[in-house]
Amino acid sequence: MLPGTSRLPTEASMSWVLLSVLWLIIQIQVIDATLTPELKPHEIVRPKKLPISQKRGLENNQTERYGKEEKYAPEVQYQIILNGEEIVFHLKRTKHLLGPDYTETSYSPRGEESTRHSQDVKPCYYEGHIQNARGSLARISTCDGLRGYFTHRDQRYQIKPLQSTDEGEHAVLPYSWKGQDTVHDKDAEKQVVRKRSHLRTSRSLKNPNEDLLQGQKYIGLFLVLDNAYYKLYNGNVTQMRTFLFKVLNLLNMIYKTINIQVSLVGMEIWSDQDKIKVEPNLGATFTHFMRWHYSNLGKRIHNHAQLLSGASFRHGRVGMAAGNSFCTTSSVSVIEAKKKNNVALVALMSHELGHALGMKDVPYYTKCPSGSCVMNQYLSSKFPKDFSTVSRSHFQGFLSSRNARCLLLAPDPKNIIKPTCGNQVLDVGEECDCGSPEECTNLCCEPLTCRLKSQPDCSEASNHITE
């Protein structure tokens, strides 16, 4: 059951995101976007996989730790030559991309429900940076070649495989969209908030725990895909799932900046027909979804649900969320996901999630290091990977004034899908887990085996657990 109120409030604080119809123009694949004139349209590169150097005097080859059979190591390095310059990606496997109790529900043509617990999701999603390039970022999947995004020297790039192998030919494309950075119309000048009372939990935190402000926080995200979205993929659930996992990888890049780990804990696909009335009126669809969520998903462990719709809504509206609703049963949002690439979709998902976490829209001129703020009132052509000072203040206020303790609920170690030594989580069968050899600072924990060292002071496992 979701933390928070025990019944559905009759009124909810709803935050509208009013964005231009022109936004639809840029919902094409990034590779089709207008390219920066001074750069080559694309460059063909051949990534070279590099061995991970062992630090602290460790001579063991990494295959001893990861095993020869493991295709996707927890840490990898790739080298490419771009514009005559050597670039080395240093990547670490994304942790907890899926929650320990992840389920996937779909329906037969007769309406019969089928739920599976996915245990075989490829662990091929990575995050990291470019070696010796301060401020660089990389989010890349290695499932069938290298595919993803990275930033270098204030330029954004997409890399995609031309062959289904990580060391074959790849295309690297710089991208930006033609026209103004912000896309809007006259009706999208400011955020519209319904004149309804704010959702309240049973009590407020007068003296918030320091963990809420400084500690690691967790979000269990549940995705619902309507029938129109399902049809966009012609019923190919594998293709749809792979795309959404890439989006989730980008979502984590954004929320990692405020110490939040987002895990996908469930997905429901309305493959036979919609379970609510999805209509052009976004507000009405939102109300239908919120009531369906309360009646049908209350017993599934999560703390925010998003409906991704393949339909279009009136007046160019593309998203709606219940503001300040996190840790309540009304923590939901609806997003128009029709024909959006992963960058465009994650921009909307992160924005609406921000509203549920107490963040309001910020003016278009608000500055963020990446050039685009997550909570900007207008969508931008730039990947929004930063929260402004104002948004961080809003979030801190939410943590201080509301019962936001559900953000501290980490996945239960005994339910982790697949034990992985080096993920800093005490999995079943491990005596300790202090991370990779480069990360480990625990003198009693052996990072290669996740076993306690045979030293007199290292006998109590409970004293040497890193979580």
UniProtKB/Swiss-Prot annotation:
Gene induction: Induced by immunization in mature dendritic cells (DC), in marginal zone (MZ) metallophils, in follicular DC (FDC) and tingible body macrophages of germinal center. Down-regulated by steroid hormones and PRL.
First-tier enzyme category under EC: hydrolase
Cofactor note: Binds 1 zinc ion per subunit.
List of residues binding Zn(2+): 351, 355, 361
Residue ranges of the TM segments: none
SUPFAM superfamilies named among the record's database cross-references: Metalloproteases ('zincins'), catalytic domain
Residues that make up the propeptide removed upon maturation: 34-208
GO MF annotations, alphabetized: metal ion binding; metalloendopeptidase activity
Tissue-by-tissue expression: Expressed highly in uterus during pregnancy.
Gene Ontology biological process terms in this record: proteolysis
Residues in Disintegrin domain copies: 418-467
Enzyme Commission code(s) on record: 3.4.24.-
Active site (record annotation): 352
Metal-binding as UniProt keyword: yes
Signal peptide region: 1-33
Principal location: secreted
Cofactor(s) listed: Zn(2+)
CC per GO annotation: extracellular region
Glycosylated residues in this chain: 61, 236
Sections of the chain in a coiled coil: none
Domain of life the protein comes from: Eukaryota
Disulfide bonds: 327-406, 368-373
Compartment list: Secreted
Role summary: May play an important role in the control of the immune response and during pregnancy.
UniProt protein name: ADAM DEC1
Native source organism of the sequence: Mus musculus (Mouse)
